[in-house]
Amino acid sequence: MKPPILIIIMFTVISGTIMVLMSSHWLMIWIGFEMNMLAIIPILMKKYNPRAVEAATKYFLTQATASMLLMLGIIMNLLLTGQWAVLSTLNPIVSNTMTVALAMKLGLSPFHFWVPEVTQGIPLLSGMVLLTWQKIAPLSILYQMAPSMNPHLLMTMALMSVLVGGWGGLNQTQLRKILAYSSIAHMGWMIAVMTYSPTLMLLNLSIYITMTLGTFMLFMFNSSTTTLSLSLTWNKLPLITSLILIIMLSLGGLPPLSGFIPKWMIIHELTKNNMIITTMLMTITALLNLYFYMRLTYATALTMFPSTNNMKMKWQFESTKNMTMLPPLIVISTMLLPLTPMMSTLF
């Protein structure tokens, strides 16, 4: 893809998301979603091959269906209230229709089937955009709609997402699929606390995006896409491999890393609102996520694969890739826990 075309496409993707974030008019929000969806497809197919085309087609069909449902909800809301404003969405049927549409866009369970397949079929850079930037616009609309949404529907989808995110990643060897299932689980945690503390959801989103960006950048740095290729990099790039494992444990929510903060605060918020059983179920299923990250860490760091001396010296001759954002992302992804008392005063 030529640089000018790529710049135009990226500008359209960013403009679509910003339009959704800044609008309180349903038609402008829908147009922003469509701009974003149509512009992201060439990015998904940046490396043109059959798997990328299949992934982009699955993504397009899912997002088009979600956009159709969203437009149906917008029209129903217009007929019932005569208004285009987001905050006028008070009818339960309209609210549920829009919630389902946005859940499809986010990849929440039971509409999660496209997320692992699409993420696996596209390059690492495209996967990074899909699992971070593409989550911002739908979550911003859910944030605005939080007072009028059905809490039982949200909690059901949240529980299913956390369960699917943990269960689905157990037997995976592809790193992109593991991150896709981790994304589903994180979305579940965000949706669970949406009706009780929408601001806490934003904290969870920011920490999730930071950790996922750092993980994808490290994967791109050492060109790892499978657990086998990751385990073989221990001899070549020991420091980078160690950082990958620490960030992945943070994604799993292991204390004292940054990924533990949102889970801790969400558990506190849910128990404060007497959601004891739901919190217990979510906490138990979150252990599945932590388990497959710890298993990956054990296989990579504590079991050394046979290697030659030439392989061990190979890292000295590799050209280094310039990733300026990597050090701050790694620090934020691992060392934010001491700031928790200050954060707790804000939510």
Swiss-Prot record:
Gene Ontology biological process terms in this record: mitochondrial electron transport, NADH to ubiquinone; mitochondrial respiratory chain complex I assembly
Subcellular location as annotated: Mitochondrion inner membrane
One cellular-component annotation, GO: mitochondrial inner membrane
Subcellular location, principal: mitochondrion
Membrane topology: Multi-pass membrane protein
General function of this protein: Core subunit of the mitochondrial membrane respiratory chain NADH dehydrogenase (Complex I) which catalyzes electron transfer from NADH through the respiratory chain, using ubiquinone as an electron acceptor. Essential for the catalytic activity and assembly of complex I.
Subunit composition and interactions: Core subunit of respiratory chain NADH dehydrogenase (Complex I) which is composed of 45 different subunits. Interacts with TMEM242.
Protein name per the record: NADH-ubiquinone oxidoreductase chain 2
Organism the protein comes from: Mustela kathiah
